[in-house]
Curated annotation (Swiss-Prot):
<keyword id="KW-0133">Cell shape</keyword>
<dbReference type="Pfam" id="PF10555">
    <property type="entry name" value="MraY_sig1"/>
</dbReference>
<dbReference type="GO" id="GO:0071555">
    <property type="term" value="P:cell wall organization"/>
</dbReference>
<feature type="transmembrane region" description="Helical">
    <location>
        <begin position="135"/>
        <end position="155"/>
    </location>
</feature>
<feature type="transmembrane region" description="Helical">
    <location>
        <begin position="218"/>
        <end position="238"/>
    </location>
</feature>
<dbReference type="GO" id="GO:0051301">
    <property type="term" value="P:cell division"/>
</dbReference>
<keyword id="KW-0573">Peptidoglycan synthesis</keyword>
<keyword id="KW-0132">Cell division</keyword>
<dbReference type="GO" id="GO:0009252">
    <property type="term" value="P:peptidoglycan biosynthetic process"/>
</dbReference>
<feature type="transmembrane region" description="Helical">
    <location>
        <begin position="283"/>
        <end position="303"/>
    </location>
</feature>
<feature type="transmembrane region" description="Helical">
    <location>
        <begin position="307"/>
        <end position="327"/>
    </location>
</feature>
<feature type="transmembrane region" description="Helical">
    <location>
        <begin position="185"/>
        <end position="205"/>
    </location>
</feature>
<dbReference type="GO" id="GO:0008963">
    <property type="term" value="F:phospho-N-acetylmuramoyl-pentapeptide-transferase activity"/>
</dbReference>
<keyword id="KW-0808">Transferase</keyword>
<keyword id="KW-0131">Cell cycle</keyword>
<keyword id="KW-0812">Transmembrane</keyword>
<dbReference type="InterPro" id="IPR000715">
    <property type="entry name" value="Glycosyl_transferase_4"/>
</dbReference>
Length: 379
C-alpha cells in the first residue's frame, strides 16, 4: 500500500524524488521487518491482557513432563498477533500486484485459521481436544492443494515452473508436470497431480513440524526467526537476475517481493519472542505454529527450494522425525527410541534445563540454516 502510494503515485506520476527509495527491495524489506517487530512489541501487552481476560489459557497434557504443569493457564492463541504482524507490514510495504505475495499471505491466513479453530475448540472444551487428527490433516491438505493449484494457474501464464531444483546437482531438474496431458483443455489439471501431491507433502509437513516443535518457551519461534531469515536471503537472490545466475538458481524476478513477506515474518517472530521467551507470558498455539509452518513451506515451494527446506528448518525436521520414529518403533517393536517425543522432551527427561535445550536447539537451527545457504555455491 505504501509502495503504491509513495512510489507508483508520488514518484512515478509526480516525480517526487525522495520517494524513489521505495523502489528498493532491501529498503522495503528492512522496514517491513521493523514494522512487524514494533507491531509485536506494542500490541503484545494488550493481546496478552485480553487473552487473560477471556481466560484463554493453555491446557497441559498430564502425560507430558511434570515440569510443564506449572505452565497450565498461560494465555495461548498468541499466534493471532504473529499473523497480524506478518500480514499488515506485507500489505504496507510489498507490491500488491505481485501474485506470489498474495499466495503466501493467503496460505498463512488459511493455515492460521485451521490452527485458530483447533485452539478455540481446546479452550472451549477446557481439555486438549481440538480438531480430530483426520479433520486437521484434511483441512491442511485442502489448503496445500489450493496453494498448488494457484501456482499451477500462475505457471500456465508463464510466470512459474514445476521443475524441482535438486541441491548439489546443477543439471538435474525433474519436472512434476506430465507434459503430454497439460495440452488437453478439459483434463489439463490431471497433468499436475504429481506437483499437487508434492506441494501437499511439503506444506502439511512443514506446518506440522513447526507445530511439534512448539513445546518449550521460545523454541519454535526462535527457530522460525532463523529459518525465515534464511528464506529472506533466498527470496532476494532468487529474484535478483545477477545473483540468481551466479548461484545457479532459477531466475524468477517476481519472487523477490517475497523477501518483504519473509522480512515481516522475521520481525514478527522476534516481536513475539519478547513475550514468549522463558518463562513465557503467552504461547502461540496452533494458530501461530500452523501459520508459520505454512508460510515457510509456501515460500520454499514458490522459490523452488523445497528440497533445501529440510536444511533451512533442520530442527523442525528433527522434531517431526523423532515423533515418526517413536510412533513407528512402538507400533512395530513395542519399544520406544526416545524417553519421550518430540525430541525436546527427550532432553528434558535426560535432565537438561529448559533454557539450555532452547538455546542449543537455536544454535543447531542456525548451523542448519547457514549450511543451507552455503549449498548455493556448491551446486
Amino acid at each position: 500500500m505504501l509502495y503504491w502510494l509513495l512510489y507508483e503515485k508520488a514518484f512515478l506520476l509526480h516525480n517526487f524524488t525522495p520517494f524513489r527509495i521505495f523502489r528498493y527491495l532491501t529498503f522495503r524489506t528492512a522496514f517491513a521487518s521493523l514494522t512487524a517487530l514494533f507491531m509485536g512489541l506494542i500490541i503484545g501487552p494488550a493481546v496478552v491482557r485480553r487473552l487473560r481476560e477471556f481466560q484463554i489459557g493453555q491446557y497441559i497434557r498430564e502425560e507430558g513432563p511434570k515440569s510443564h504443569q506449572k505452565k497450565s493457564g498461560t494465555p495461548t492463541m498468541g499466534g493471532v498477533l504473529i499473523t497480524i504482524a506478518i500480514i499488515v507490514p506485507t500489505l504496507l510495504w510489498a507490491d500488491l500486484s505481485n501474485k506470489f505475495v498474495w499466495i503466501a499471505m493467503l496460505a498463512t491466513i488459511a493455515f492460521g485459521a485451521i490452527g485458530f479453530t483447533d485452539d478455540y475448540l481446546k479452550v472451549a472444551n477446557r481439555r486438549n481436544l481440538g480438531l480430530t487428527a483426520r479433520a486437521k490433516m484434511g483441512l491442511q491438505i485442502l489448503v496445500a492443494i489450493l496453494v498448488a493449484i494457484s501456482l499451477v494457474l500462475v505457471q500456465r501464464h508463464g510466470h512459474y515452473n514445476t521443475h524441482l531444483i535438486v541441491p548439489f546437482i546443477k543439471s538435474f531438474h525433474p519436472d512434476l508436470e506430465i507434459s503430454k496431458l497439460a495440452t488437453y483443455p478439459h483434463i489439463w489439471i490431471i497433468a499436475y497431480i504429481p506437483f499437487l501431491a508434492f506441494v501437499a507433502i511439503v506444506l502439511v509437513g512443514s506446518s506440522n513440524a513447526v507445530n511439534l516443535t512448539d513445546g518449550l518457551d521460545g523454541l519454535a519461534i526462535g527457530c522460525t526467526v532463523i529459518a525465515a531469515g534464511a528464506l529472506t536471503v533466498l527470496t532476494y537472490v532468487s529474484g535478483h537476475a545477477q545473483f540468481a545466475d551466479y548461484l545457479g538458481l532459477s531466475r524468477m524476478p517476481e519472487v523477490g517481493e517475497l523477501s518483504i513477506f519473509c522480512g515481516a515474518m522475521v520481525g514478527s517472530a522476534i516481536g513475539f519472542l519478547w513475550y514468549n521467551a522463558h518463562p513465557a507470558e503467552v504461547f502461540m498455539g496452533d494458530v501461530g505454529s500452523l501459520a508459520l509452518g505454512g508460510a515457510i513451506g509456501t515460500v520454499a515451494v514458490i522459490i523452488k527450494q523445497e528440497l533445501l527446506l529440510p536444511f533451512i528448518g533442520g530442527v523442525f525436521v528433527l522434531e517431526a522425525l523423532s515423533v515418526i520414529l517413536q510412533v513407528g518403533s512402538y507400533k512395530l517393536r513395542k519399544k520406544r527410541i526416545f524417553k519421550m517425543a518430540p525430541l525436546h522432551h527427550h532432553f528434558e527427561l535426560l535432565g537438561w534445563s529448559e533454557s539450555k535445550i532452547i538455546v542449543r536447539f537455536w544454535i543447531a537451527s542456525l548451523v542448519f540454516a547457514l549450511f543451507a545457504l552455503t549449498t548455493l555455491k556448491l551446486r
